[in-house]
């Protein structure tokens, strides 16, 4: 900010820029040409009056150049030093996981030890809501059937999973769809189409009941299969309704007019009859020209000929007419799965833009001691509502408590966007992540898996009280002679196998050998004595 002082011999004129100061006191002491340099402070940092005793003027025109030093309102109000500011690139913080189905996503969560899963979902108005849950609350069944978050059933899209490298804890950001709202709308349409009317040979109305789709059929590729099934279901339903409508029109108009046409009356919004058509080809040509019956006028019920439609037939005809425009618009917009994929890409792009807009791009450095003296009521930089749920009509106290436990920063949701410093020293996520931690999060440094913790017994018993280890061949045996139950080997005794211990068995075997050796000698001598001395 500079001010120009113009001096003429006859008069003194002062020209200032719009943001110049109100008072300038200039003292003329000598006639030398001196360029003075003074330091000023803005109204935020200093006073408005400026005293420059060294400023001099001359009879000729001189220019006084001033250098101003401004104080940043951010550092003046919050005490944050601007020299220690780290700028985080949001594009580098969101790294795509490359998951294609729920199975790969749950394997990634388990193998990489992901701690938090941040779920985002849009509402009917296009507003995005976010909530953070623990990874142990997510399972393969939840990914297939839906995760219950804040009273809503959310279907996660594994193809949109991204690593959030801006947070200290390992976090995955996933986009989801609220299937409670979509299932309710689909169920209302299914109620209309579940019971379709068919004329039997006898002329009576029949009902066709279709079984609901199994929940576990979406296991292979949930996101892609859900989009394709939804688009195919809408197109097949509209085609089926159109065929049924043409069939009922032709059958009801068979006795009333021409055999190949149908009488259709057209009315405007006030109920005045405009014109009528008596040809099926006219209806078909308008259908191909406008992408369906696109004239915008409500149709009257078909004229009753030789046979009426019946109560259920009239209800089905009215339901098909009510949903005709919606189905035709669906057929025009969704020419296969490409239209749905395009809308999904637009949804993904808007989701990423919402995340980038709600993230903090300027993070203060905690090494500055000025952050420790910040007051709770002092203004702070605005941060996005990436933590906590701002869903309307829901109690967010439990979610905010969980989020405050997960990360040291509590950020209010909705339009608040303020930094809540509750207790102690707290920092935004990603403020203390150094290069080593970033390398670990990005996968450049691989750490060994955690070792299993040692198992400690509740109470240790002495060796005397510990039970003795049983041998593999231990049985309930005891020695028949000494009564012992512990022996290195069991031996044969008079009562059979394994009836004596090792010591008693050896002693018994020696006795048996001695007896066997003594018996033949006695018998031999006895026989010789009998031979030599035969008895009478």
Curated annotation (Swiss-Prot):
GO cellular component, one term: nucleus
Gene Ontology MF annotations: transcription cis-regulatory region binding; zinc ion binding
CDD domains according to UniProt: ZnF_GATA
Pfam families: GATA (PF00320)
Extent of Polar residues compositional bias: 1-20, 36-55, 273-283
Region described as Disordered: 1-77, 183-211, 237-258, 273-342, 370-423
Biological processes annotated in GO: regulation of transcription by RNA polymerase II
Zinc finger map (GATA-type): 479-504
Composition skew (Basic residues), residue ranges: 237-247
Name of the protein described by the UniProt record: GATA zinc finger domain-containing protein 9
UniProt organism field: Dictyostelium discoideum
Gene: gtaI
């Amino acid at each position: 900010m500079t001010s120009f002082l113009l001096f003429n011999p006859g008069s003194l004129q002062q020209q200032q820029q719009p943001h110049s100061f109100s008072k300038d006191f200039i003292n003329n002491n000598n006639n030398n040409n001196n360029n003075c340099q003074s330091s000023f402070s803005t109204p935020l940092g200093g006073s408005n009056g400026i005293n420059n005793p060294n400023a001099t003027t001359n009879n000729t025109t001189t220019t006084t150049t001033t250098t101003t030093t401004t104080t940043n309102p951010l550092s003046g109000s919050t005490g944050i030093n601007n020299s220690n500011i780290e700028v985080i690139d949001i594009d580098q913080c969101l790294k795509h996981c490359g998951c294609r189905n729920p199975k790969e996503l749950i394997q990634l969560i388990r193998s990489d030890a992901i701690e938090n899963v941040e779920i985002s979902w849009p509402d009917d108005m296009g507003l995005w809501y976010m909530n953070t849950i623990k990874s142990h609350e997510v399972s393969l069944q939840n990914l297939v059937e839906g995760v219950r978050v804040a009273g809503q059933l959310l279907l996660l899209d594994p193809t949109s999973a991204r690593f959030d490298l801006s947070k200290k804890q390992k976090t995955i950001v996933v986009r989801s769809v609220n299937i409670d709202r979509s299932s309710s709308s689909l169920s209302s349409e299914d109620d209309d189409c579940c019971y379709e009317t068919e004329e039997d040979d006898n002329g009576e109305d029949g009902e066709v009941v279709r079984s609901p789709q199994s929940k576990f059929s979406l296991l292979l590729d949930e996101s892609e299969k859900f989009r394709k099934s939804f688009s195919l279901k809408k197109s097949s339903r509209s085609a089926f309704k159109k065929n049924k409508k043409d069939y009922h029109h032709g059958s009801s108009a068979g006795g009333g007019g021409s055999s190949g046409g149908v009488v259709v009356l057209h009315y405007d919004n006030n109920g005045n009859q405009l014109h009528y058509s008596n040809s099926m080809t006219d209806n078909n040509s308008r259908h191909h020209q406008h992408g369906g019956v696109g004239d915008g006028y409500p149709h009257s019920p078909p004229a009753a000929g030789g046979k009426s439609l019946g109560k259920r037939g009239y209800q089905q005809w009215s339901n098909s007419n009510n949903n005709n425009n919606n189905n035709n618009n669906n057929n025009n917009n969704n020419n296969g799965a490409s239209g749905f994929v395009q809308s999904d890409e637009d949804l993904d792009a808007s989701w990423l833009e919402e995340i980038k807009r709600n993230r903090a791009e300027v993070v203060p450095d905690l090494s500055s001691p000025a952050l420790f003296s910040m007051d709770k009521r002092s203004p702070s930089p605005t941060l996005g509502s990436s933590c906590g749920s701002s869903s309307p009509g829901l109690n967010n106290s439990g979610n905010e408590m969980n989020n405050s436990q997960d990360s040291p920063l509590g950020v209010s949701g909705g339009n608040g966007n303020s930094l809540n410093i509750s207790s102690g020293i707290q920092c935004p996520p990603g403020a203390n992540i150094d290069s080593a931690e970033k390398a670990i999060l990005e996968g450049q440094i691989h750490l060994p898996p955690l070792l299993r913790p040692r198992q400690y017994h509740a109470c240790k018993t002495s060796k005397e009280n510990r039970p003795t280890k049983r041998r593999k061949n231990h049985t309930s045996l005891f020695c028949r002679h000494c009564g012992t139950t512990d022996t290195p080997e069991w031996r044969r005794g008079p009562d059979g196998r394994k009836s004596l211990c090792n010591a008693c068995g050896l002693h018994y075997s020696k006795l048996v050998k001695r007896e066997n050796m003594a018996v033949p000698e006695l018998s031999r001598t006895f026989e010789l004595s009998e031979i030599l001395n035969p008895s009478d």
